[in-house]
A protein has these predicted regions:
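Bacterial N-terminal signal peptides that target proteins for export
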Residues: 2-14
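Gram-negative and organellar
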Residues: 28-504
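Bacterial N-terminal signal peptides
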Residues: 11-23
Length: 504
């Protein structure tokens, strides 16, 4: 696909949104958001190379390397050894355009329609930017009917729950009882791949190869929630079924809740259970205390990655890690905030042995920072973070200065450092970042952004493979908000979905 055709594809969503806007002028109300973002970046690539095993030499550290100093990887019994050389500079130019349209006042009280789509293209010569295929993606497109007791939704939609974010094409229904504070919902449809708006059978997900399902999975689930004066709770169930094999792709249940026993105190928590693998997934509990001067939080959590049963990753039996953490925000004066956070974690036993090496199974992370606003124009922020874990560690500083010289203009300068020594690699990479951003709002309907950043990377290696991956990125964006006269008029009274305080 040529750059011209890719640019045309990227503009398709904007034209589609404009066309839908014109066709909806007879409706009582609409709201349209058009957003375009572009970036230009150049960075060093790499190319694979090989050398005969007979031509390698032993380097000063005892490993094999080429005659000109590149470390190589030699498999037992192989005639050739592989390594990477610096490649040509690659030019990337991602352009993303999105349109988000909502229509209402369609002749039925409570009926609305929403369409959210995006187009992406790589205008660079190398065509290497990920996420630009397919060029057109439909994120959401559904009709929604809402009343005081019932809500129904039909079409492509994103479901956000304790079990994660997943998209599907189908229907969802919600029933409420204000007197009891209860809400029940159920949904059914054809699921999308996780973290994408594409079917799991799409050719764009071809790295799955022979493990890729040939048909879209069937997604079904539901939930029951309660909300009252002192808290809320929700129970959820979700399953995915492979339509070809008739086998479960996943089956999980989750329970989450929030308790407000006293003023300023909040307890939140949740747990997930994988019925297919018969183990507990993510779980967490936290206690928060909030005042005007201090906010403090302590908590504990378990993290275990979730993989669908049809993938190969579940065969590795991922073990969870358990962590305890604490955070605090202190505001001694009105314009100053101090913050700090720390966490300690440890992995469960993996039931494997490493007789030739000792491997850590625990780690910690911490961060401190401060934000200061001497007046309404300037805001200064700085922080330090450090982390040490199995196989790697990192530490670095970050700082930013923001200025609002005009109500419509915001300027930001920022910088950061990151050092990342790796236990099982040769290099100890370091990255320094300097950048500038500007945002101009000439009206309440238009927002323009412009920025640039330089990333300087130092890959400290004992051989000549310390490839310079420094790069400069430039970005620009525009966001346009459009709406009908009904959109600018006074909003109707909100639909209450929770019982009034004190009714329970």
């Amino acid at each position: 696909m040529s750059r011209v055709s890719r640019a045309r594809s990227a503009g398709f969503v904007a034209l589609l949104g404009a066309g839908l806007l014109v066709s909806s002028l007879e409706a009582q109300g609409y709201r349209l958001r058009l957003d375009a973002r572009a970036q230009a970046v150049a960075y060093r690539g790499v190319r694979a190379d090989s050398v005969l095993f007979a031509d390698v030499v032993v380097g000063p550290t005892g490993g094999y390397q080429t005659a000109d100093g590149f470390f190589v990887h030699c498999q037992s019994g192989a005639r050739h050894c592989s390594f990477y050389r610096p490649g040509p500079y690659l030019q990337g130019g991602p352009l993303v355009t999105s349109a988000d349209l909502t229509l209402w006042g369609l002749g039925i009280n409570g009926l609305s329609v929403r369409v959210n789509a995006r187009a992406g293209a790589d205008l660079g010569d190398s065509d290497v930017w990920p996420g630009t295929e397919p060029p057109i993606q439909l994120m959401e497109a559904y009709a929604d009917y809402a009343s005081r007791r019932v809500t129904g939704r039909l079409g492509r939609q994103l479901l956000v729950s304790r079990l994660g974010i997943i998209g599907f094409d189908g229907g969802r229904a919600i029933i409420r009882s204000q007197q009891l504070g209860l809400e029940a919902d159920g949904y059914l449809g054809y699921g999308l791949a996780r973290a994408t708006a594409l079917p799991v059978s799409s050719s764009a997900i071809n790295p799955l190869d022979e493990f890729q399902p040939r048909s879209r999975q069937l997604l079904a689930g539901g939930g029951l929630g309660w909300a009252g004066r002192y808290g809320q709770a929700r129970l959820e169930y979700q399953r995915e079924v492979d339509r070809d094999s008739r086998q479960f792709g996943s089956e999980r249940v989750a329970l989450s809740g929030e308790l407000r026993p006293f003023t300023r105190w909040t307890v939140t928590g949740g747990v997930e259970y994988d019925l297919a693998n018969t183990w507990f997934g993510n779980a967490d509990v936290s206690l928060r205390y909030t005042t005007a001067a201090v906010t403090a939080l302590v908590g504990a959590r378990q993290y275990r990655p979730h993989f669908d049963l049809w993938t190969i990753w579940g065969a590795f039996s991922p073990v969870p890690y358990h962590a305890v953490n604490a955070s605090v925000w202190v505001r001694p004066v009105a314009r100053l905030e101090l913050r700090g956070r720390g966490e300690r974690y440890a992995y469960s036993p993996t039931e494997t042995s490493t007789p030739l090496v000792d491997v850590d199974d625990d780690g910690w992370r911490l961060g401190v920072g401060a934000s200061f606003s001497p007046n309404a124009v300037w805001t200064l922020d700085a922080g330090y973070r450090e982390e040490y874990g199995p196989g790697a560690s990192s530490d670095g500083f970050e700082a930013s200065i923001s200025a609002v010289p005009l109500a419509q203009l915001t300027l930001t300068a920022y910088g950061a450092t990151l050092d990342r020594p790796l236990e099982f690699r040769f290099e100890e990479a370091g990255v320094d970042v300097l950048g500038l951003d500007a945002e101009w709002r000439p009206s309440d309907r238009l927002r323009l952004t412009l920025g640039g950043a330089h990333y300087r990377e130092d890959r400290r290696r004992p051989d000549v493979s310390g490839i310079d991956w420094s790069q400069t990125r430039l970005n620009a964006g525009a966001t346009l908000f459009l709406g009908s006269g009904a959109d600018r008029s006074r909003l109707p009274r909100a639909l209450r979905t929770r019982p009034p305080a004190g009714t329970r």
